[in-house]
Design a protein with these regions (language model features):
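Paired small-residue
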Residues: 68, 72-75, 83-91, 289-295
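Conserved MFS/SLC helix-loop-helix module at the cytosolic interface between two early adjacent transmembrane helices
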Residues: 44-82
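A late C-terminal transmembrane helix in Major Facilitator Superfamily
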Residues: 311-349, 358
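Helix-breaking motifs and short loop linkers at transmembrane-helix boundaries and internal kinks
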Residues: 25, 57, 78-84, 95, ...
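Juxtamembrane intracellular "pre-TM" segments in multi-pass secondary transporters
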Residues: 170-199
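Helix-loop-helix hairpin linking two adjacent transmembrane segments in secondary transporters
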Residues: 84, 121-166
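Cytoplasmic helix-loop-helix junction between adjacent transmembrane helices
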Residues: 88-127
Length: 384
């Protein structure tokens, strides 16, 4: 439930963006900025939430983060202009970042190696169900009432999981007795070149995915003139593809190391984004079905990338797993905020800006990983 918090906060309101823009007397572009602001705020929350969790424990960090998330959500519900939405969206995101970073950290507290990768893959299935259902939930709520009720739903969800975790989440990380500063914890992770290779692999993969998430409303509902009712179903096809790839990843982990499967996912993203870029460049009028298929294949590759990059990274830092997870998330979501903003800034009413940025992200990820990891040792626990 905790891992679904951010996918719900990101995707549930996507069908409501045109209505929000009209209600707040602003443009769709300005309303879409709230998505990039959430990604940036989420990154900030993870930066501080990781070391906080490693020092004070998982329960304290989770409770604090969910409280901040609910305060920000309440502010959005009563906002009367887009600038207020931007402000409270950042507050909401910071709380989400502080809370969600604990999910992967708890898994690392209790497992490692291939076991950790399998547990993270199972967690990813839950994460993927959320963006599949979120636009549908948003669409239903939108037809019942208006966009504000979507954020009421998020508030109730945050309060519910906060109560459940308070009653049922055991403490898997005792309060640290040593005084290790946040900067020392991050310096430890940032000085590890092999770990950085995995971190930036996930970073650029997330950047490519958020370029799609940000650009998909204008591409599907604008360029291809798809209705608000059909859009969530097209969006959901990508999530189904990612879930299937994730289930495949769980099976393949019985035979292959996470690092190999990560490379396989990166290669798939490069290939599909290259085909997508070539098609958009050469086709006079791109066909919707072909575009949807290629986008599904690109997003599905995330099922092989995220959990394997995460498990490979945290293997190096058993005592600072939340800090490592926070760095993974914060850099990835910051890159997602940047790529999403670029899609918005370069938007020309065609799929071109979205597709170019997706290809660039897919290509840069494995290149940076290769440069950082050349001659470096890999994790040693993945045979277990």
């Amino acid at each position: 439930a905790l891992t679904a918090l951010t996918p719900l906060a990101i995707d549930a309101y996507l069908p409501a963006i045109p209505q929000m823009a009209s209600d707040l007397a602003t443009s769709i572009h300005d309303t879409e900025i709230s998505l990039s602001l959430y990604l940036a705020g989420f990154a900030i929350g993870q930066i501080f939430g990781g070391p906080f969790s490693d020092h004070f424990g998982r329960r304290a960090a989770t409770g604090s983060g969910l409280s901040i998330f609910c305060v920000g959500t309440l502010g959005i519900i009563f906002s009367q202009d887009i600038h207020s939405v931007w402000l409270f969206r950042v507050i909401q995101a910071i709380g989400g970042g502080v809370a969600v970073v604990n999910a992967a950290a708890v898994i690392r507290d209790l497992s490692h190696g291939k076991d950790s990768a399998r547990h993270l893959s199972n967690m990813a299935v839950i994460m993927m169900l959320a963006p599949l259902l979120a636009p549908l939930i948003g669409m239903i709520i939108l037809h019942l009432s208006g966009w504000r009720l979507i954020f009421v739903f998020l508030l109730v969800y945050g309060l519910s999981i906060g109560t459940a975790l308070f009653l049922r989440l055991p403490e898997t990380r005792k309060k640290a007795t040593e005084r290790t500063s946040m900067f020392k914890r991050y310096a430890m992770v940032l000085s590890h070149r092999c770990a950085l290779g995995f971190i930036f692999s996930q970073c650029f993969a997330l950047a490519g995915m958020f370029a799609f998430i940000t650009g998909s409303p204008s591409v599907y509902m604008g360029y291809f003139d798809i209705s608000e009712t059909v859009y969530p179903f097209l969006f959901g096809l990508n999530v189904i593809g990612m879930m299937l790839a994730n289930r495949l990843n769980i099976r393949l982990l019985h035979y292959y190391r996470p690092q190999f499967l990560l490379s396989l996912g990166q290669a798939a993203q490069v290939l599909t984004s290259l085909i997508l870029l070539s098609y958009v460049s050469l086709a006079t009028e791109p066909n919707l079905v072909i575009m949807v298929i290629l986008l599904i294949l690109f997003i599905a590759s995330m099922g092989l990338i995220v959990s394997n990059a995460t498990s490979s990274t945290v293997e190096f830092f058993p005592q600072n797993s939340a800090t490592a997870t926070a760095l993974l998330g914060s850099i990835g979501f910051a890159a997602g905020a940047l790529s999403g903003s670029l899609v918005g800034l370069l938007g020309d009413g065609t799929p071109w800006p979205m597709v170019v940025i997706m290809f660039a992200c897919a290509l840069i990820g494995p290149l940076v990983r290769t440069m950082l990891q050349y001659g470096q040792p890999s994790p040693t626990h993945n045979h277990s």
